[in-house]
C-alpha cells in the first residue's frame, strides 16, 4: 500500500483463482490410433493359393504315374520263331520316349514349384511369385500337351492301325502293352487339365481388383 498527497492506492494481490483464470489453456494431446485392416481380397486369394498347392500335388501324382507307367511298359509274346521274337517296348517308338521325357520334366518342375506355391499361401499378394508360376506353368502345359498328343497318335494306331499305310493294329496281340500305354496317356491328359487350371488360377490371382 502506498500513500500520496492527493490519492491513496492499495495494491491487492491476485487470488489463486484469478491467476488460474489468466493461465494459458493447453489443449490435451490427441493421440491418433491406427488399426491395420485386412485387405478385402486376402481371403479368396489365400484360398486360391491353398487350392493351387493341392492341385500341384495332384499333378505330381499324374505326371509321375504317366512317366513311370510308360517308362516300364514292355511285353514279349510267349511264342517266337527261329528268327523273330515278338516284343513291344516303349523305347521302340520315339514318340513314347519323348512322352516319358516330357512328363518326367513336368513332374520334376511341379516338385520344385511346391515351395513357391507354399509361400503364396502366407503371402497371397506377392505378385512376383505368381508371375513366375504362371509363366513356368504355361511352358510346362505346352510341353506336357505335346508329349500327350504325340503318344496319343501312336496309341490310336496301335488300337486301330492304318489300312492305307498297311499298318496293322497290334493291340489284339500286345494287350498288356496297349493297356499300359493307354493308361499313361490318360494320366498325362489329367495333368494337362490340372496345368490349365493352375494357369487360370494364377491369372485370376494377379488381378488387382
From Swiss-Prot:
Stretches in topological domain Extracellular = 68-95, 159-183
Task: Report the superkingdom from the record.
Answer: Eukaryota
Q: Which GO terms describe its biological process?
A: cell wall modification; cell-cell junction assembly
Q: Where are the transmembrane segments?
A: 47-67, 96-116, 138-158, 184-204
Tell where it localizes: Cell membrane
The record's keywords, sorted A to Z, are: Cell membrane, Cell wall biogenesis/degradation, Membrane, Transmembrane, Transmembrane helix
Q: List the disulfide bonds.
A: none
Q: How does it sit in the membrane?
A: Multi-pass membrane protein
Mapped to this chain, the residue ranges on the Cytoplasmic side of the membrane are: 1-46, 117-137, 205-209
What assembly does the database describe for this protein?
Answer: Homodimer and heterodimers.
What the record says about family reads: Belongs to the Casparian strip membrane proteins (CASP) family.
Q: What is this protein called?
A: Casparian strip membrane protein 1
Gene source species: Vitis vinifera
Q: What is the lineage of its organism?
A: Eukaryota, Viridiplantae, Streptophyta, Embryophyta, Tracheophyta
Amino acid at each position: 500500500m502506498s500513500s500520496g498527497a492527493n490519492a491513496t492506492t492499495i495494491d491487492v494481490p491476485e487470488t489463486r483463482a484469478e491467476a488460474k483464470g489468466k493461465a494459458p489453456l493447453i489443449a490435451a494431446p490427441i493421440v491418433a490410433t491406427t488399426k491395420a485392416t485386412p485387405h478385402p481380397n486376402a481371403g479368396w486369394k489365400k484360398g486360391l493359393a491353398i487350392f493351387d498347392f493341392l492341385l500341384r500335388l495332384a499333378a505330381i501324382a499324374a505326371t509321375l504315374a504317366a512317366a513311370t507307367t510308360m517308362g516300364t511298359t514292355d511285353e514279349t509274346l510267349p511264342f517266337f520263331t527261329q528268327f523273330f521274337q515278338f516284343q513291344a517296348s516303349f523305347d521302340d517308338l520315339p514318340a513314347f520316349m519323348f512322352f516319358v521325357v516330357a512328363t518326367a520334366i513336368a513332374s520334376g518342375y511341379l516338385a520344385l514349384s511346391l515351395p513357391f506355391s507354399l509361400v503364396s499361401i502366407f503371402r497371397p499378394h506377392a505378385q512376383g511369385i505368381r508371375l513366375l508360376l504362371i509363366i513356368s506353368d504355361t511352358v510346362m502345359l505346352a510341353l506336357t500337351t505335346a508329349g500327350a498328343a504325340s503318344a496319343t497318335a501312336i496309341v490310336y494306331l496301335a488300337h486301330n492301325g492304318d489300312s492305307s499305310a498297311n499298318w496293322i493294329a497290334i493291340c489284339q496281340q500286345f494287350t498288356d502293352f496297349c493297356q499300359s500305354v493307354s493308361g499313361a496317356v490318360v494320366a498325362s491328359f489329367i495333368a494337362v487339365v490340372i496345368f490349365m487350371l493352375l494357369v487360370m488360377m494364377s491369372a485370376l490371382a494377379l488381378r488387382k481388383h
